[in-house]
Structure formats: C-alpha cells, structure tokens
C-alpha cells in the first residue's frame, strides 16, 4: 500500500512529505521510500505560528486564517511529493500549537492530576478534499485520553522501520525538540526489553530563537553551526541548567515550545549576558547536546543499557557544531547521521507518520505504554474521508 506522510515540526519551518510503500507484517514491515518533498512556510506565517505557540494572545479569526494556510501548504506538499496521486492514504501530523503533558496525581502542585492535552493545527476535512484521499490525523489524542503523554509517537515506528542490531540502537531526532528512541538488540538478555523513548529537551528551538535575536532578524538559524563554532561554551552555566527539574526527571516525559520558547530563552540569555554572541550561541548549542548525553549517562548509572550507536535525524544534524558536541559528550557511543543507513535525515518523521497512518488502516497500535505512560496500547489517529 502506498501512503503519503506529512510532518511539520516544532521549528515551524514548513512541511516535509514522504511517499512510501508498505507491505508485510505491521510490526516488521517491508518498506520503500519512493519520493520526498518540502514546502516552506512563508516567513510571516512562520512568525505568527511561533508567536502563538509561545502564548501570544491571538484573535479567533486569525487562528482560523492560519489553520487554513497551514492546511493549504500541507496539501501543496502532498501534491509536490505525489503529483500522480498514487498514494491511497495520507497521514498528517499537523502543526503543534500547544502540548500539555499530564500531571500525575500526588504531585505537590495545584495542577496535580490534570489530564494531558495537545493541539495540532489542521483542517483535516479540507486537506482530504484538496488531496483527494482519506486523511489520518490527530495521532496524539487517543494516547492522551488513556493517560499518556501523547508523545513521543515515533519510537515504535522507528523500531519497525530500522530493525535491530547486536546491541542497543539509538535514534535521535533534532527538530525543535530533541527526542530519542532506544531499540533493544536482536539477541541476548535484552532482546525482550521494550522499546524506549522520550523527549530529552530543546534541540533547535532555543538556538534558532537566539540566532534570530543576535542577528537582528537577518538569520533565523545558525548555518552549519558557524557562529557557535567560533564561541566558547560556558560550562558552569550549562551545568546549572542541567540541574533543572525537567532534565532530572525520568521518562515518560514530553515537552515542547511552550516550555522551551521565548520566555525560557530570555532567562538563559540574561544569565549569559556578560558573554559574546558567539559564546552565548555556543553554550545553547552545547546545551542541546548535553541534555541528550545526561539522559544516556543516567541510563547507565541505573543499570539500563546504553546504545552502541546513535543515528541522528532532523534539521539539527546539519549543524556541525551540534554534531561535534554530541560526539564529545556521548562518550562510548558512535554518533552518525541516519542517512548512513538510507533514512534521509530531513524526512524521517514524515516517513514515520506515513507508517502510523498505515498502522491505523491495519488496526495496529502505534503507541507504547512503556514510552508514553498510557494505560494501554491503542490504534492512533482519526480518519477523515474526502467529502
């Protein structure tokens, strides 16, 4: 079955599309990536989405206008990737505007026991009409309804797509947020261990916001990590950041721009104010690597497995300074781009949502309670047919 996957991440750069063929057993499918395409968001739309996602009050009419624009760009990406409409199904994540993980009962907080919720902006019926095929969307809702985090959703798909090796294998996505998947080995005492996954913390969110500010709006990201590469990391400040509650908490956990956004950047840049722009960006870049390395060290310290390799995808893998920091801090782990194994770094998540849509069609669960904390595994997504 041919399925088209669409993904627009936390960085709100635009829409990535992946056309794939799936067949065989859902848990271990045979697959081929047939085509990929990207359509960027216009800069004005990107800015409006980011401001709203960081809590800026927005008129209802403007929300409607943005959701129409986002949906139309999703449809444009679908057409560019599959102009002959060979796919019979479309899986679309939508644009995350707010993600609110659940708060366990018993926590010393006024929000103790609060259920989780998440909003992915999309007009699914319009997308089904514009693309001329059924759309599977709202993938997080069922997991959240079962008490889960609703994220990350990629680990089970990662395990199905990449398969197993002799040791633990890690897949790290460096989008706006850094999320990691750990796949158990194909033999040995850990072979029955469940797949693991969680959100480590910020990847590109803080770096991109900082670059926009430091460049006076001329640059929205640090190309190849060039400016950060000229700076020196403020290790003392970095170590303080790593002691913040989110980074000391254990999975299941998920996060987003609502936590690591403009307000968070303002606080961190105030602490780095005496330092040069290059040093500030170097420290933020190292921070994105350090949150991953700290999580892996904690696994080892508690007797959990450490991956023998870490395959990196997402826009952050094009940041050479960030990749160097990962290799430096993830000691004993081979760090390399996922493209080394023919999984395009930019389109991994689009491929994942194509697979999740296929799983929905097959009635196969897409989440994992060990990862999200949901009460049970369940089929993800809602289906909308063309009118």
From Swiss-Prot:
Keyword ATP-binding attributed: yes
PANTHER family: ANHYDRO-N-ACETYLMURAMIC ACID KINASE
Pathway: Amino-sugar metabolism; 1,6-anhydro-N-acetylmuramate degradation; Cell wall biogenesis; peptidoglycan recycling
Binding, ATP: 9-16
Catalytic activity reported: 1,6-anhydro-N-acetyl-beta-muramate + ATP + H2O = N-acetyl-D-muramate 6-phosphate + ADP + H(+)
Top EC class for this record: transferase
Entry's Gene Ontology molecular function annotations: ATP binding; kinase activity; phosphotransferase activity, alcohol group as acceptor
Residues forming coiled coils: none
TM region positions: none
BP GO terms, sorted: 1,6-anhydro-N-acetyl-beta-muramic acid catabolic process; amino sugar metabolic process; peptidoglycan turnover
The protein's name: Anhydro-N-acetylmuramic acid kinase
Gene: anmK
A family per Pfam: AnmK
Enzyme Commission numbers on file: 2.7.1.170
Function: Catalyzes the specific phosphorylation of 1,6-anhydro-N-acetylmuramic acid (anhMurNAc) with the simultaneous cleavage of the 1,6-anhydro ring, generating MurNAc-6-P. Is required for the utilization of anhMurNAc either imported from the medium or derived from its own cell wall murein, and thus plays a role in cell wall recycling.
Family: Belongs to the anhydro-N-acetylmuramic acid kinase family.
UniProt keyword Transferase present: yes
Keywords assigned: ATP-binding, Carbohydrate metabolism, Kinase, Nucleotide-binding, Transferase
Highest taxon in the source lineage: Bacteria
């Amino acid at each position: 079955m041919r399925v088209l996957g669409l993904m627009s991440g936390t960085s709100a750069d635009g829409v990535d599309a992946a056309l794939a063929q799936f067949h065989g057993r859902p848990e271990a499918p045979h697959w081929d990536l047939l085509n990929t395409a990207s359509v960027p968001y216009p800069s004005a739309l990107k800015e409006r989405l980011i401001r709203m996602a960081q809590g800026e009050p927005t008129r209802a009419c403007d929300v409607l206008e943005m959701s129409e624009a986002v949906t139309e760009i999703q449809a444009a990406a679908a057409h560019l990737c599959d102009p002959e409409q060979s796919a019979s199904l479309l899986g679309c994540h939508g644009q995350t505007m707010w993600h609110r993980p659940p708060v366990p009962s018993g926590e010393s907080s006024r929000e103790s026991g609060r259920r989780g919720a998440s909003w992915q902006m999309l007009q699914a019926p319009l997308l089904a009409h514009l693309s001329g095929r059924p759309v599977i969307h709202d993938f997080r809702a069922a997991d959240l309804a079962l008490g889960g985090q609703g994220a990350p959703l990629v680990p089970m798909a990662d395990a199905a797509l990449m398969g197993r090796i002799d040791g633990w294998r890690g897949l790290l996505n460096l989008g706006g947020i850094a999320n990691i998947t750990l796949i158990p080995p194909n033999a040995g005492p850990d072979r029955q261990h469940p797949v693991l996954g969680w959100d480590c913390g910020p990847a590109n969110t803080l770096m991109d916001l900082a670059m926009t500010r430091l460049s006076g709006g001329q640059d929205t990201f640090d190309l190849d990590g060039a400016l950060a590469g000229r700076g020196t990391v403020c290790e003392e400040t970095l170590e303080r950041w790593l002691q913040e509650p989110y980074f000391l908490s254990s999975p299941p956990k998920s996060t987003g721009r609502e936590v690591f956004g403009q307000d968070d950047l303002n606080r961190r840049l105030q602490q780095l104010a005496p330092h040069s722009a290059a040093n500030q960006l170097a420290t933020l870049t190292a921070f994105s690597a350090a949150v991953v390395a700290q999580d892996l060290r904690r696994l080892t310290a508690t007797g959990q497995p450490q991956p023998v390799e870490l395959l990196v995808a997402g826009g952050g893998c094009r940041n050479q300074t960030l990749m160097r920091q990962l290799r430096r801090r993830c000691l004993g782990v081979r760090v390399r781009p996922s493209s080394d194994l023919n999984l395009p770094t930019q389109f991994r998540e689009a491929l994942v949502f194509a697979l999740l849509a296929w799983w929905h069609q097959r009635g196969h669960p897409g989440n994992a309670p060990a990862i999200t904390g949901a009460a049970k595994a369940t089929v993800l997504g809602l289906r909308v047919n063309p009118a």
